[in-house]
Amino acid sequence: MAQKIQKTNVCRLLDAAGVEYELIEYAVDEADLSATHVAQQLGEDVDAVFKTIVLEGDKIKHFVCVVPGACEVDLKKAARVSGNKSCKPIPQKELLPLTGYIRGGCCPIGMKKPFPTYIDETCLMHEKIYVSAGQRGMQLRLTPQSLIDYVPLTVSDLI
């Protein structure tokens, strides 16, 4: 009998809201937590695997950007859409206390506090996208619109 995948808190939130998703496990390589590695493990295009980046701005203290795995957030674009003049990624040591997530497991769903959250417009080119399920080794596969509606996300040009 196959072992049942243990659901994450993110999954429980989506279940409670009636959001359809697929939970997928993959082998974690602690030396390579990149979205490219995750995409290889999933056998998917890295452009469909989105990563969650937490930023701090000069006006809006903290906000979140969700971008395709092979891309970097354009900080000028991120600052503009978030109402900041400038922004930068938060230091890694601040990620867990601020969001409740660790690097490689950060998800735009279920953070400790709600932050303004933006997703790159390229998400709409995919029928389904992947985002972390809230812990390393687990990804959610869902429609971009489901994610946009649930969080909620603002669709923007971020790359």
Regions found by a protein language model. Give the residues of each.
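Extended, low-hydrophobicity, polar/charged segments
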Residues: 1-159
